[in-house]
Curated annotation (Swiss-Prot):
A zinc finger (C2H2-type) spans 168-190, 196-218, 224-246, 252-274, 280-302, 308-330, 336-358, 364-386, 392-414, 420-442, 448-470, 476-498, 504-526. Disulfide bonds: none annotated. The keyword Transcription applies. GO terms for molecular function: DNA binding; zinc ion binding. The lineage of its organism: Eukaryota, Metazoa, Chordata, Craniata, Vertebrata. There is a cross-link at residue 125 (Glycyl lysine isopeptide (Lys-Gly) (interchain with G-Cter in SUMO2)). This is Zinc finger protein 82. One of its GO terms (cellular component) is nucleus. Belongs to the krueppel C2H2-type zinc-finger protein family. InterPro entries: KRAB, KRAB_dom_sf, Znf_C2H2_sf, Znf_C2H2_type. It is found in: Nucleus.
Length: 530
């Protein structure tokens, strides 16, 4: 009996590099499953001799787009036209990269139609022959059933993705995944396993795809170029993220504070600020970090005592970028200048934040009271007023603070150190900011002016407090009687009415007062008597 020749290229699917990199992990795994299934099914027919390059690459964990797949000529000239006819619509073709068209292309490979046609042709020839080849027909039927079984599993996989079922759960942290391979990759975070090593620099990676991308750093290969500005990138996702700079698109928004990001990864990292999640733990000291890069820098610090040292003053830094910014202190370099007022900055981020003082932009809004802020960090600090959170505690007296800077300032009370002296009057201060504020007294400088009435102030905080007179805002409310105040200090004094607290006591007559000003006024009574 003459058999219809089947070659693996007829039932394989070719991807260009760009197409392959646009697939997500589930699609790549499904592709690998299909190719291996097709290979075993066709091999079971005994139709080709050597293992195809694409199968070798997949077995080695390499990316299959590197292989240029071409059709091999059918060895049976009599059946060549028949084979081509079978695959005329299911051969290799240019692909539309919509998500499910890719999946359909993978799932609907022409293997089943070929095998069913082969089975029908075989049965037709069997009827014309006196000696049927039952063994071959059984093999065709069995292989057909295997392909049908695969198609059912492919459908199940697609359905599982559609309904977002995540059956594979990590025993270490409970995180769940849709695909088993994702769980395998994730496990390596906990075990620290990095089986793929770069031969150039020795750097190791958890996934072979990460190694492939890394190797482009050594080759200098930049395949992705921006059509707007001509800038080239090593990775496709880098180009896509860069293009959003031109469009201004920020599709990923934080539900907690409303901040928007160009890249989903930036949103994921940002959300850990709200959740407090720190998944990366140093096995040496137990310290945890929100980002893997922060853990990596920390671990380098443990290995090398002084990683990045300033040659001018000897100060050490965790990373090279920190040293470069610091070095501008010595050179006086301030390359980022504000076009509105001419003020210059060492760091671009400082300029961005400064420009909001001109535009009045305050993108961060408190969901509790509606107050807006120009910086996300200020919103986080403000939110602690509503929650009452005070995460920074003094180990000397156990007093707690909502800000780390407040704790540092407080600790100098116990130490008694005042390292900052005023050259004009000799007065000493615990903090440099206190000295700076004090020096404006000698200079007579009042740089902060109210736009409503023109009154000037030495401190920005004083201006902010003054402006509440014009706005009528009273954000500090007493929970006992609902009375509201412009100043937090006024609320604190008012609360003593309800609590009966009188912390200021006269040493002469032991009389106590709620406010320090009342004590000062009272002391005059004793002075007059003397």
């Amino acid at each position: 009996m003459a058999r219809v020749s089947v070659v693996f290229s007829d039932v394989s699917i070719a991807f260009s590099q760009e197409e392959w990199e646009s697939l997500d992990l589930e699609q790549r795994n499904l592709y690998k499953d299909v190719m291996m299934e097709n290979y075993h099914n066709v091999a079971s027919l005994g139709c080709f001799i050597s293992k195809p390059d694409v199968i070798s690459l997949l077995e080695q964990g390499k990316e299959p787009w590197k292989v240029v797949r071409q059709r091999k000529p059918c060895p049976d000239s009599e059946t060549k036209d028949e084979t081509n006819q079978v695959f005329s619509e299911n051969g290799i073709y240019e692909m539309n990269l919509s998500q499910w068209k890719i999946m359909e292309r993978i799932g609907n490979s022409g293997l089943k139609s070929l095998l069913l046609k082969n089975g029908w042709e075989s049965r037709r020839k069997q009827e014309r022959q006196e000696d049927p080849q039952e063994g071959y027909l059984s093999q065709v039927r069995h292989t057909s059933e295997r392909v049908s079984s695969y198609e059912k599993r492919a459908l199940t996989t697609r359905q599982r993705i559609h309904f977002v079922e995540k059956p594979y759960e990590c025993n270490e942290c409970g995180k769940a995944f849709r695909v088993r391979q994702q769980l395998t990759f994730h496990h390596r975070i906990h075990t620290g396993e990095k089986p793929y090593e770069c031969k150039e620099c020795g750097m190791a990676f958890r996934q072979t795809a990460h190694l492939t991308r890394h190797q482009r750093l050594h080759s200098g290969e930049k395949l992705y170029e921006c059509k707007e500005c001509g800038q080239a990138f090593i990775y496709g996702p880098e180009l896509r993220a860069h293009q959003k700079l031109h469009t201004g698109e920020k599709p990923y928004t934080c539900r907690e504070c409303g901040k928007a990001f160009r890249v989903r990864g930036q949103l994921t990292l940002h959300q850990r600020i709200h959740t407090g999640e720190k998944p990366y733990v140093c096995q040496e000291c137990g310290k945890a970090f929100r980002q893997l890069a922060h853990l990596t820098r920390h671990q380098k610090l443990n290995v090398v005592d002084r990683l990045y040292e300033c040659k001018e003053c000897g100060k050490d830094f965790l990373c090279g970028s920190g040293l470069r910014v610091h070095h501008k202190l010595h050179t006086g370099e301030k390359p980022y200048e504000c076009k509105d007022c001419g003020k210059a900055f060492r760091v671009r981020q400082q300029l961005t934040l400064h420009q909001r003082s001109h535009t009045g932009e305050k993108p961060y809004e408190c969901t509790e009271c509606g107050k807006t802020f120009s910086r996300g960090y200020h919103l986080i600090l403000h939110h602690r007023i509503h929650t009452g959170e005070k995460p920074y505690e003094c180990k000397e007296c156990w007093k707690a603070f909502s800000r780390y800077s407040q704790l540092i300032s407080h600790q100098s009370i116990h130490i008694g150190v005042k390292p900052y002296d005023c050259k004009d009057c000799g007065k000493a201060f615990r903090l440099l900011s206190q000295l700076t504020q004090h020096q404006s007294v000698h200079a007579g400088e009042k740089p902060y002016s109210c736009k409503e009435c023109g009154k000037s102030f030495r401190l920005r905080q004083k201006l902010a407090l003054h402006q509440s007179i014009h706005t009528g805002e009273k954000p500090f409310e007493c929970k006992e009687c609902r009375k509201a105040f412009r100043l937090n200090s006024s609320l604190i004094q008012h609360l003593r009415i309800h609590s009966g607290e009188k912390p200021y006591e006269c040493k002469e007559c032991k009389k106590a007062f709620r406010q320090h000003s009342h004590l000062t006024h009272h002391l005059k009574v004793h002075t007059v008597k003397v």
